[in-house]
């Protein structure tokens, strides 16, 4: 059982105290429903070697290390491979390099310098396997709660968390919609790689705003297109082979949407075209990746003939 009492204690005396009281029961109800592969993934977690890191780096990457032999490293490799595919990372765990599909460290190097997370209570919506949560702690966050309903990501987070049990990071297998309305308890809320999967983008912005304290900061990272404030791409069907992509606005359009949703001090801090070096198939993620989803003769287009992935990071205040 995952004991959330440290989280409840951490949130005592904060605007999130009332919410925290029901989290253990909510988590256990979700675990009761479970997932068909959950037992297999739990088996992988249980086979991880029992180690205590003597070196922890969450600032320049995500690296844990200690003195261990080749047999222990082989055990670590096999257990972590049992939690494949690994999407976000990379992770360096006791001499095992988990070369994930995404070079999420590249994204963090673009986003992180624009943020002040020192002492902040942070929510990461659609947190994946928690890679960014650890980097947020490395940047000085007081505590980080991630929410993502994907059970594999939940188990991948537990794989790292079992070696860092004292650190104030928690992964809850919940969707944003399962959080109460008007939570208003986080200093910083992240939504990275989620917005374009939402059928109702303004509703998503309002839900994110609901999670923030007054004056809190939103970090929004999403797919965009080039154009003016009236330009928005709605794919006819798939986008880069993804069925669940709905709205790709231009940066000026997205800035307008944020202002319309009641945010202020809206500004874009980064726009980057995603390269096949940043997102690709690896030993740890053997399925198709970005290179398979782009026009082989023109990487400026997807296989559907739409503009290739371009991602922007915007900051805004409640």
Curated annotation (Swiss-Prot):
Which BP terms does GO give this entry?
tRNA wobble uridine modification
Q: Where is the signal peptide?
A: none
Q: EC number(s) in its UniProt entry?
A: 2.5.1.-
Q: Which reaction does it catalyse?
A: carboxy-S-adenosyl-L-methionine + 5-hydroxyuridine(34) in tRNA = 5-carboxymethoxyuridine(34) in tRNA + S-adenosyl-L-homocysteine + H(+)
Quaternary assembly: Homotetramer.
Q: What does this protein do?
A: Catalyzes carboxymethyl transfer from carboxy-S-adenosyl-L-methionine (Cx-SAM) to 5-hydroxyuridine (ho5U) to form 5-carboxymethoxyuridine (cmo5U) at position 34 in tRNAs.
Q: What is this protein called?
A: tRNA U34 carboxymethyltransferase
Q: Which organism is it from?
A: Pseudomonas entomophila (strain L48)
Q: Name one Pfam family in it.
A: Methyltransf_9
Family matches, as CDD domains: AdoMet_MTases
Question: Which parts of the chain are coiled coil?
Answer: none
Q: Which gene encodes it?
A: cmoB
Output one GO MF annotation.
Answer: methyltransferase activity
């Amino acid at each position: 059982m995952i004991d959330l009492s440290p989280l409840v204690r951490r949130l005592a005396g904060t605007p999130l105290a009332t919410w925290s009281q029901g989290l253990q029961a909510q988590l256990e109800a979700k675990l009761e429903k479970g997932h068909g592969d959950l037992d297999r993934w739990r088996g992988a977690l249980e086979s991880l070697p029992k180690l205590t890191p003597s070196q922890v780096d969450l600032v320049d990457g995500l690296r844990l290390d200690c003195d261990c032999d080749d047999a222990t490293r082989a055990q670590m490799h096999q257990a972590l491979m049992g939690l494949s595919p690994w999407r976000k990372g990379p992770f360096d765990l006791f001499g095992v390099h988990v070369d994930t599909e995404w070079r999420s460290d590249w994204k963090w190097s673009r986003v992180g310098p624009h943020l002040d997370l020192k002492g902040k209570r942070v929510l990461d919506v659609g947190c994946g396997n928690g890679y960014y949560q650890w980097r947020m702690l490395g940047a000085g966050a007081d505590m980080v709660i991630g929410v993502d309903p994907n059970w594999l990501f939940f188990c991948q987070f537990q794989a790292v968390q079992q070696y860092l049990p004292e650190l104030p990071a928690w992964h809850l297998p919940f969707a944003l919609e399962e959080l109460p309305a008007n939570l208003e308890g986080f200093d910083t809320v992240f939504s990275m790689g989620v917005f374009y999967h939402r059928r109702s983008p303004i509703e998503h912005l309002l839900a994110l705003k609901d999670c923030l304290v007054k004056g809190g900061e939103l970090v929004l990272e999403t797919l965009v297109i080039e154009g003016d404030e009236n330009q928005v791409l709605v794919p006819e069907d798939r986008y880069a082979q993804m069925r669940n992509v709905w709205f790709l606005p231009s940066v000026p359009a997205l800035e307008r949407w944020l202002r319309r949703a009641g945010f202020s001090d809206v500004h874009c801090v980064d726009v980057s075209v995603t390269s096949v070096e940043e997102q690709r198939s690896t030993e740890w993620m053997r399925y198709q990746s970005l290179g398979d989803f782009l026009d082989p003769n023109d990487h400026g287009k997807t296989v559907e003939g739409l503009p290739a992935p371009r991602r922007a990071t915007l900051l805004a205040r409640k």
